[in-house]
């Protein structure tokens, strides 16, 4: 079901109202505590700026790291408040806690257009337990709820789900709306042919996604370390490559399922091998039926890149989740970079290209092609669960579109 969005609320409905906005500000920081990538902060700006323009009193809630219900000074949101202040061009008010007298007093004293950032919501144990008393206390800060934290939407926590029971309306922010539009749209009503490229090292972490995508897609292309589990299941020798021996039957079953549904399931035909797992390992290219003992596959080979490019050529929608190899090592990044380049070209031709979270986002950004894709998801686990066809609690809690 489609969810109600912030765009449905007018300035008249929001002016002077305190609006609780759950955002995803779980940004990477270096040893000094400086933010190394502010993408997630910038992704929330359209929602925050719209609320400011409509005269709302904006109360932002976010988590950072895994403090496990304890106050941890290294996980305070102070650097985030500073960066957000710079991006907005005016001071963001920061609280010492997400509940209690300081938060209440600052919320009550907000003026129209002010922005306040609550301290790390995971400092309170009730957040991850979805404690109704804690959710109620959060709700008392505001009158309207907006969820713009797609990256946390797969968690039924107090700030993503529990709080909606005490506030109304509960709507999606613009980032959440865009994520659902692209990811849900690709699953429910894609322009076809629809292809999925699934990579990563383990079949076990992508079982649900592969099961679901084989049901929905016209083509499924598999790369990354998980290919060796499929090869071993076919009876091929894989040398020292990563294999999940307890998933061999599953790999066979997935190939059978694709065959029975008439879905084109493509695996690489050649691989780039290394004699050890390091950036400066010796390397060679081998066909999949002639991988020598003592070598491990760390990337898809050039023939496979061509095979995948040809398969994608006529596609109208492509979802990519997971790299083709160990792209962090330059010697073994060609497969991943080639797929990124291919998708950027397809995008320019009108194909809808969706980078579905996690390492594939990092790969596209490393290749400098992020701005060439139709949509880059901000959710890791949330993207996977949505592609698996699961209900996301943070989305389910929002008001239905009339």
From Swiss-Prot:
Family (UniProt): Belongs to the phosphoglycerate kinase family.
Residues where ATP binds: 206, 297, 328, 357-360
Question: Taxonomic classification, please?
Answer: Bacteria, Bacillati, Cyanobacteriota, Cyanophyceae, Synechococcales
Gene Ontology cellular-component terms for this entry are: cytosol
- What subcellular compartments does it reside in? Cytoplasm
EC number(s) in its UniProt entry? 2.7.2.3
Catalysed reactions, as listed in the record: (2R)-3-phosphoglycerate + ATP = (2R)-3-phospho-glyceroyl phosphate + ADP
Protein name (record): Phosphoglycerate kinase
In terms of InterPro entries, this protein maps to: Phosphoglycerate_kinase, Phosphoglycerate_kinase_CS, Phosphoglycerate_kinase_N, Phosphoglycerate_kinase_sf
Extract the SUPFAM superfamilies matched here. Phosphoglycerate kinase
Please list the GO terms describing molecular function: ADP binding; ATP binding; phosphoglycerate kinase activity
Q: Name one GO biological process term.
A: gluconeogenesis
Keywords from the UniProt entry = ATP-binding, Cytoplasm, Glycolysis, Kinase, Nucleotide-binding, Transferase
Q: In which pathway does it act?
A: Carbohydrate degradation; glycolysis; pyruvate from D-glyceraldehyde 3-phosphate: step 2/5
Give the main EC class.
Answer: transferase
What subunit structure does UniProt give? Monomer.
- For the ligand (substrate), the binding residues are 24-26, 40, 63-66, 122, 155
Q: Signal peptide location in the record?
A: none
Organism of origin: Prochlorococcus marinus (strain MIT 9211)
